[in-house]
C-alpha cells in the first residue's frame, strides 16, 4: 500500500528523473537501517544453473542499474541475482531526452534510451567495490558509433575487462534503440559473434582459471523460423544460456493509448505473451541443453509461474518492480 502511494507521486515526475530518485532513495543509509529493522529476511530457495548457485530464481533485469551504482542497495530487495548494464566500451549519452514513456493503463513502458552509460571502466570499479556476494551478471553492448561490421570488437573489449568480476556475461544484440544492432542476430554476423566470444571466453578461462558463463539476449520480434535457427547455433557454439526477451517494436497491443506512438522498445505487461511464446519455442528447440532466463511482463506470481511453465529456468523483472514495488519481488520469491 505504501509503495502505491509513493508511485502516484513518482508518476507525476518525468520517468527518467523518477528512476534516479528511487535508486537514490534505496541507496540512502536511513532506508537501509529501517530495512534491517522492519523487513523480514527472504528464505533461501537456491537453484543451480549454468554452473552457478542462485539464491532464488528471481533476478533484476538489465537497465535498472546501468552503471552498477546501486548493486548493494538493490540486492537488499531479495533478488537471487542482479544484472547490471547495458554497458559499452566507451561512455555515451544515448538518445536525446525524453526517452522513457509510461503506459500506466496496461503497465507498459516504452524506452529509447540508446545504451546511455558511463563506460565499462566505471562499471568495473563499481562491481569491484560492491559488497554483494550473490550473482552479478554484466550486460554488454556496442557503442553507437561503432560500425556493425566492427561490433564484435566492442564485445570482446568488454569481455576482457569484466571477465574476472562477472558471475555471468550477457551479450545484448537485441536492443531496438541502437541502429542496426539487431542485425547481429542474423546470418554470418551472428555466427562470427558466437565463434569469437567463445574463443575469448576460452582465453579468459585459461588466464584466470575461472569459467564465466556467457548468455545471449534476444529479441521478441524474431519469427519461429529465426528462433529455431538461433537455437541450433546456440547449441552448436555451446553458448551457456539465453535471455528471452528484450523489448518489442510491436506496439499493436496498445492502440489509442497515450504514448503509443512514441518510438522505442515496449516492455511490461504488453510484452508478456510475446516473451512467453519465444520461451516456449526456445525450450522445444534447445532440448534442455541450454538454460533460458525469461523476462517480459512479469507482474504477478501467476505470470512468474507461466514463465517457468513455458520453459524458463530463471526469470527477471524490471517493469513489474516499477509498477508494484519491492514487496512484489519478495512475494514472488516466497511463493514461487
Swiss-Prot record:
A GO molecular function held by the record: dihydroorotate dehydrogenase (quinone) activity
Keywords linked to the UniProt accession: Cell membrane, Flavoprotein, FMN, Membrane, Oxidoreductase, Pyrimidine biosynthesis
Gene3D superfamilies: Aldolase class I
CDD domains tied to this protein: DHOD_2_like (cd04738)
Residues that, per the record, bind substrate: 66, 111-115, 172, 177, 246-247
Record-level GO BP terms: 'de novo' pyrimidine nucleobase biosynthetic process; 'de novo' UMP biosynthetic process
Swiss-Prot/TrEMBL catalytic activity: (S)-dihydroorotate + a quinone = orotate + a quinol
Binding site for FMN: 62-66, 86, 139, 172, 217, 245, 268, 297, 318-319
Chief location: membrane
Cofactor notes: Binds 1 FMN per subunit.
Pathway per the UniProt entry: Pyrimidine metabolism; UMP biosynthesis via de novo pathway; orotate from (S)-dihydroorotate (quinone route): step 1/1
Bilayer topology: Peripheral membrane protein
Function field: Catalyzes the conversion of dihydroorotate to orotate with quinone as electron acceptor.
Summary of subunit composition and partner proteins: Monomer.
HAMAP family in alphabetical order: DHO_dh_type2 (MF_00225)
Protein name as catalogued: Dihydroorotate dehydrogenase (quinone)
Species, as recorded: Buchnera aphidicola subsp. Schizaphis graminum (strain Sg)
Amino acid at each position: 500500500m505504501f509503495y502505491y502511494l509513493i508511485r502516484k507521486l513518482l508518476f507525476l515526475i518525468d520517468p527518467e528523473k523518477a528512476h534516479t530518485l528511487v535508486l537514490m532513495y534505496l541507496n540512502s543509509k536511513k532506508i537501509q537501517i529501517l530495512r534491517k529493522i522492519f523487513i523480514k529476511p527472504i528464505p533461501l530457495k537456491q537453484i543451480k544453473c549454468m554452473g552457478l548457485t542462485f539464491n532464488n530464481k528471481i533476478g533484476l533485469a538489465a537497465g535498472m542499474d546501468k552503471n552498477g551504482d546501486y548493486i548493494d542497495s538493490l540486492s537488499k530487495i531479495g533478488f537471487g541475482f542482479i544484472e547490471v548494464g547495458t554497458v559499452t566500451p566507451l561512455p555515451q549519452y544515448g538518445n536525446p531526452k525524453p526517452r522513457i514513456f509510461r503506459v500506466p493503463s496496461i503497465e507498459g513502458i516504452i524506452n529509447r534510451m540508446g545504451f546511455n552509460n558511463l563506460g565499462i571502466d566505471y562499471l568495473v570499479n563499481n562491481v569491484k567495490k560492491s559488497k554483494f556476494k550473490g550473482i552479478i551478471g554484466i550486460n554488454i553492448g556496442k557503442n553507437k558509433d561503432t560500425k556493425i561490421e566492427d561490433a564484435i570488437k566492442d564485445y570482446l573489449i568488454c569481455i576482457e575487462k569484466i571477465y574476472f568480476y562477472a558471475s555471468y556475461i550477457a551479450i545484448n544484440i537485441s536492443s531496438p534503440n541502437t541502429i542496426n544492432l539487431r542485425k547481429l542476430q542474423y546470418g554470418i554476423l551472428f555466427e562470427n559473434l558466437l565463434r569469437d566470444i567463445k574463443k575469448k571466453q576460452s582465453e579468459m578461462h585459461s588466464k584466470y582459471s575461472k569459467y564465466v558463463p556467457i548468455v545471449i539476449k534476444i529479441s521478441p520480434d524474431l519469427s519461429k523460423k529465426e528462433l529455431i535457427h538461433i537455437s541450433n547455433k546456440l547449441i552448436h557454439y555451446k553458448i551457456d544460456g539465453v535471455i528471452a526477451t528484450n523489448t518489442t517494436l510491436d506496439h499493436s497491443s496498445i492502440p489509442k493509448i497515450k504514448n503509443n506512438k512514441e518510438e522505442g522498445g515496449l516492455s511490461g505487461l504488453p510484452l508478456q505473451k510475446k516473451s512467453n511464446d519465444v520461451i516456449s519455442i526456445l525450450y522445444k528447440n534447445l532440448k534442455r541443453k541450454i538454460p533460458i532466463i525469461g523476462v517480459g511482463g512479469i507482474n504477478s506470481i501467476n505470470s512468474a509461474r507461466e514463465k517457468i511453465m513455458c520453459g524458463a529456468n530463471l526469470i527477471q523483472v524490471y517493469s513489474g518492480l516499477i509498477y508494484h514495488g519491492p514487496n512484489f519481488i519478495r512475494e514472488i520469491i516466497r511463493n514461487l
